[in-house]
Amino acid sequence: MATNFTQELYEIGPMAYPLKMISKDVAEHMLGWNIPEEHQDLVHDHWRNFPAVSKYWHYVLALIYTMLMVTSLTGNGIVIWIFSTSKSLRSASNMFVINLAVFDLMMMLEMPLLIMNSFYQRLVGYQLGCDVYAVLGSLSGIGGAITNAVIAFDRYKTISSPLDGRINTVQAGLLIAFTWFWALPFTILPAFRIWGRFVPEGFLTTCSFDYFTEDQDTEVFVACIFVWSYCIPMALICYFYSQLFGAVRLHERMLQEQAKKMNVKSLASNKEDNSRSVEIRIAKVAFTIFFLFICAWTPYAFVTMTGAFGDRTLLTPIATMIPAVCCKVVSCIDPWVYAINHPRYRAELQKRLPWMGVREQDPDAVSTTTSVATAGFQPPAAEA
């Protein structure tokens, strides 16, 4: 079979299979050749049409994931440490930031498994190893998606209704519990074979839910998880951010019109301006993370929908591994987005880890100084 495939490849030419990799030392094997007979049902027939990937590609992938793991553990670890121990950051809104960092760290727990699989060039633990890997990925991926939606809701409430719209600690705790419950159904159901199942994909060193089996049950499962874990969070995020930006524009327009009527430059005090500026910067951080979420998960959503309903010939091993890497990259970038843009987080970083070279003035100190200066200023008395 391998000889016929190689001969066909040479006859048709390299352009017909641009993403299929053949190495001399594995040309006689096809994907799944090193999985024992009793576990062969794990591998879908689609993957058996591709030659086994060179061991060097496995090593490159292991190196990439090692770097991602170190970056994510460092960044998310610092986020959880600073947000959970800093008095200035101990707010209901920042509980969602910690929750997102926990989901990101959970995704990184997959990395040791994948690195080990890459060196063995197969799944270690077979079905059990596949289930553990996929459960971690499902919980963290779906949980992170809905947490982004909750953060968008919180930013909208905080900025559009700063006096009575802020979420309190109890409400934040309930919303965090909701994110975990939201991630459970499509993690538990395939893990226990109640609906769907977890199977290897790509290089057969990673696992996800089955989107290749040709039956109605699998197709309905793929459609439902697509709506549940991608479409609904995306719709909520888009709605809340559109409402947020609309509220900001309306507020600015009202202030400008009122100031024009009163023949003054601005109705907002310096303290209000500073406070609002901080909140808007935080909203920009949240929106940036949402954008990263789209970049990370849209390619993988395309892969799964193509596998279930589209042209499967597009899904070569490397074509499915690239979106999988993108999903892991975003969990590494999230904490550094906060380091770049979140004013109070940057101020705490400067205090605790000065060697990182962060330069940020404490927003609360700026507001206090501005208020004192404004209160202490007295206009000169009019001459008699």
Swiss-Prot record:
This is Opsin-3. Residues 1-62, 116-132, 193-219, 306-312 are extracellular. It is a multi-pass membrane protein. The chain crosses the membrane at residues 63-83, 95-115, 133-153, 172-192, 220-240, 285-305, 313-333. Disulfide bonds join 130-207. Residues 84-94, 154-171, 241-284, 334-384 are cytoplasmic. Its main location: membrane. Glycans are attached at residue 4. CDD domains: 7tmA_photoreceptors_insect. The gene is OP3. InterPro entries: GPCR_opsins, GPCR_Rhodpsn, GPCR_Rhodpsn_7TM, Opsin. Keywords: Chromophore, Disulfide bond, G-protein coupled receptor, Glycoprotein, Membrane, Photoreceptor protein, Receptor, Retinal protein, Sensory transduction, Transducer, Transmembrane, Transmembrane helix, Vision. It comes from Manduca sexta. One of its GO terms (biological process) is visual perception. PROSITE patterns: G_PROTEIN_RECEP_F1_1, G_PROTEIN_RECEP_F1_2. GO terms for cellular component: membrane. Visual pigments are the light-absorbing molecules that mediate vision. They consist of an apoprotein, opsin, covalently linked to cis-retinal. May play a role in photoperiodic photoreception. One of its GO terms (molecular function) is photoreceptor activity. Belongs to the G-protein coupled receptor 1 family. Opsin subfamily.
